Amino acid sequence: MKLERAVQIGIVVRDLDRTTELLSKIFGIGPFHFIEWPNRPESKYFFRGRPEPIKLRQAFVQVGALELELIQPLEGENNAFKEFLDERGEGIHHILFETPSMDDTVSQLKEQGIEVLQNGDGIRPGTRWALLDTQALVGFLLELRHRPGDSDGASIS
């Protein structure tokens, strides 16, 4: 197995408005697209294999070939975003790779001892994602995403 297409860097923040304003004002990054997730009633979210309530506020922006995802946890005690913020503070949380087969990729990684930390449905219908428990192994979390059909790499249109 080889992960070949990195499409996103995820950054956890305490104040999404402040962070996006600073990135825009100082570095000219933007415009940002904001969303609260889950954004559909049928969206599912699991942390360490158990369904958990969660609410996030996110901002997305394309910067060259990579998308930046800024994440502010709003609700829910049991999730990797709040855990990261509580233990490490703000910062780079994950790198996301597209995968052609979520089930096959996760199965191959489990054979190597890498477990799914959290997973769920994506913003776009039909999208699945899995955040892998790789912090101790490589110093950051790896996220996988699968969407049916061709993917342009962007989380939202």
Question: Predicted segment positions?
Answer:
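A short, hydrophobic/aromatic-rich structural module that often spans a beta strand
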Residues: 76-98, 114-124
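Long, hydrophobic N-terminal alpha-helical segment
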Residues: 1-46
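Vicinal oxygen chelate
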Residues: 6-14, 58-67, 69, 84-101, 103-157
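Conserved short beta-strand elements that form part of the metal-binding/catalytic scaffold
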Residues: 30-83, 125-149
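Residues within well-ordered alpha-helices
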Residues: 19-20, 57, 105
